[in-house]
């Protein structure tokens, strides 16, 4: 979709949750390149303001930075509502991933994962889709993960929340398409973000992508179907896990990949 058409369909404002750095910032930049104004939500105020200033100066667009914790949805809802803007595109990239054996993960960490990864995207989608339906146009991007394709030991709760995001997007894709709303879930594999690079002591895993490539492939796929899997290696991997192997075998493979997480 050309930039002009993208802006007409999803503008004038896009909201990116988790837009201060990493993949969220890559989404924000890709959207800015298409001419939309931005509302960026994130917890890290310094990083958020720096990203907002850079995009504002580079692309000469309006960029509003809102410091917010997505676990506190009521505050997020109030602050977004107070803007009284026409938001035609939602990109939900905020996430919280408790890592380790389930028995060792605290209730507070599990509740945080549910709040950030499930409750907030669900309710923010509800909030922003209503005016999109009234206008007869809009777009919603929910970040899922290849980890959500099957059970994933040591990140069991996180993987389950990512499965929720994918299933929600699939249902809304069919439900909202006749209303002019495009919905898609991005089922990404490993992404070269600051967090990933800090966690990985060795070279990146096969299929690891740059954040900008994930953002571009996802936005280019918006309107074409309910799921996008960036990267050829990741597409092949998911096909094998979902179509060629039993669920038991798929979980066993994922268990090997997540064995070192703690």
Question: What are these model-predicted stretches?
Answer:
Residues 101-103, 109-114:
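Substrate-binding pocket helix/loop in short-chain dehydrogenase/reductase
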Residues 103, 152-156:
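Active-site loop immediately N-terminal to the catalytic Tyr-X3-Lys motif
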């Amino acid at each position: 979709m050309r930039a002009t058409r993208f802006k007409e369909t999803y503008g004038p404002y896009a909201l990116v949750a988790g837009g201060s750095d990493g993949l969220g910032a890559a989404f924000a930049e890709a959207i800015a390149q298409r001419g939309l104004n931005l509302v960026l939500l994130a917890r890290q105020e310094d990083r958020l303001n720096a990203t907002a200033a850079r995009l504002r100066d580079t692309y000469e667009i309006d960029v509003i930075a809102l410091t917010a914790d997505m676990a506190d949805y009521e505050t997020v809802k109030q602050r977004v509502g107070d803007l009284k803007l026409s938001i035609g595109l939602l990109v939900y990239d905020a996430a919280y991933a408790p890592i380790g054996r389930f028995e060792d993960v605290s209730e507070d960490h599990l509740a945080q994962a549910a709040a950030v990864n499930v409750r907030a995207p669900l309710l923010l989608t509800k909030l922003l889709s209503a005016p999109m339906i009234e206008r007869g146009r809009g777009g919603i991007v929910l970040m899922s993960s290849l980890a959500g394709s099957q059970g994933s030991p040591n990140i069991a709760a996180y993987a389950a929340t990512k499965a929720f995001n994918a299933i929600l997007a699939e249902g809304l894709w069919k439900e909202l398409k006749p209303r002019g709303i495009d919905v898609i879930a991005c089922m990404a594999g490993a992404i070269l973000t600051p967090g990933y690079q800090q966690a990985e002591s060795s070279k990146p895993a096969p299929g690891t992508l740059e954040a900008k490539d994930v953002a571009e492939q996802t936005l280019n796929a918006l309107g074409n179907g309910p799921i996008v899997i960036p990267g050829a290696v990741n597409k092949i991997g998911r096909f094998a896990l979902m179509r060629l192997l039993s669920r038991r075998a798929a979980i066993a493979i994922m268990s090997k990949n997540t064995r070192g997480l703690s």
